[in-house]
Amino acid sequence: MPELPEVEVCRLGISPHVIAQEVSEVIIRNKRLRWPIPDEVCSAVGLPVLKVERRAKYLLLRFSTGTLLLHLGMSGTIRVIEQDTPVAKHDHFDLVFKHGKSLRLNDPRRFGAVLWLANDEDELGLLAKLGPEPLSDDFAEGYLFSKAKNRKVPIKTFLMNNHVVVGVGNIYANEALFQAGILPTAKAKDIDEHRMNSLTAIIKKVLSAAIAQGGTTLKDFTQADGRPGYFAQSLMVYGRAGEACVTCKTKLQEIRQSNRSSVFCPSCQQD
């Protein structure tokens, strides 16, 4: 599943190709995504993109009369292509521009989304309850510790709660907890403030490194120009169950938490 770094890489990749460019056509091949694609997305026709933003794992293309929201779901990719590029299986949506290029959404599992937000109320209804961005100043020392008080849930589950902080998905939660030396099963409320502050800094470092390396390509994700991301080569625990720990050579273990894979080193990580 594309996580925050992959969506940010996508934002950085598409922005130079679409900002200030006028939409000439909207092509919908399959409306049946996570939510049906509304006809209102055609409101973008004739308008230039003012800017491209990201909130959590949502891409937001800003226009003068509204916002086109895109979500990659479990398996989606968005690519910048020439308009005459042949249509492939699972190519559900094109945003066509006058300058000859298109944004194309490919989504085999159809858990992605394409929506039109006509006003601030629409946006608030979808995004208002999200936690802070992990790379923002709002995600600072003391924040995680204050949020974790009396929370008996495992720390990994806590980190992946979008109401606590957005965008720390399974891959990067595994990696951050390993680097912080914290077991994914440790209760959030039992982690002291010093370790929580260290974890905060490590989350920022891991996510920033992933963005710099173009994200993590495991199966579905590619960058906006079709190239893979290279952070997979830097993964220390995710996807390495049964292999030797990069630090102490202990065999990495794997468990299931909330139907997700958690990989950890029983020697380097503590409650």
Swiss-Prot record:
Which reactions are catalysed by this chain? Hydrolysis of DNA containing ring-opened 7-methylguanine residues, releasing 2,6-diamino-4-hydroxy-5-(N-methyl)formamidopyrimidine; 2'-deoxyribonucleotide-(2'-deoxyribose 5'-phosphate)-2'-deoxyribonucleotide-DNA = a 3'-end 2'-deoxyribonucleotide-(2,3-dehydro-2,3-deoxyribose 5'-phosphate)-DNA + a 5'-end 5'-phospho-2'-deoxyribonucleoside-DNA + H(+)
The UniProt keywords, alphabetically, are:
DNA damage, DNA repair, DNA-binding, Glycosidase, Hydrolase, Lyase, Metal-binding, Multifunctional enzyme, Zinc, Zinc-finger
| Any GO MF annotation of the entry | damaged DNA binding
Where does the chain cross the membrane? none
What are the catalytic residues? P2, E3, K57, R260
Residues that bind DNA: H90, R109, R151
Free-text remark on how the cofactor is bound:
Binds 1 zinc ion per subunit.
Q: Give the PROSITE patterns listed for this entry.
A: FPG_CAT, ZF_FPG_1, ZF_FPG_2
Cofactor(s) of this protein: Zn(2+)
Q: Which GO terms describe its biological process?
A: base-excision repair
EC number(s) from the headed UniProt entry: 3.2.2.23, 4.2.99.18
**Pfam families per the UniProt record, alphabetical:** Fapy_DNA_glyco, H2TH, zf-FPG_IleRS
Zinc finger (FPG-type) positions are 236-270
Subunit annotation: Monomer.
Q: Which PANTHER family match?
A: FORMAMIDOPYRIMIDINE-DNA GLYCOSYLASE
Recorded hits in HAMAP family, A to Z, give: Fapy_DNA_glycosyl
The UniProt similarity line reads: Belongs to the FPG family.
Biological function: Involved in base excision repair of DNA damaged by oxidation or by mutagenic agents. Acts as a DNA glycosylase that recognizes and removes damaged bases. Has a preference for oxidized purines, such as 7,8-dihydro-8-oxoguanine (8-oxoG). Has AP (apurinic/apyrimidinic) lyase activity and introduces nicks in the DNA strand. Cleaves the DNA backbone by beta-delta elimination to generate a single-strand break at the site of the removed base with both 3'- and 5'-phosphates.
Which NCBIfam families does the UniProt record give? fpg (TIGR00577), PRK01103.1 (NF002211)
What is the protein named?
A: Formamidopyrimidine-DNA glycosylase
Q: Which organism is it from?
A: Colwellia psychrerythraea (strain 34H / ATCC BAA-681) (Vibrio psychroerythus)
Encoding gene per record? mutM
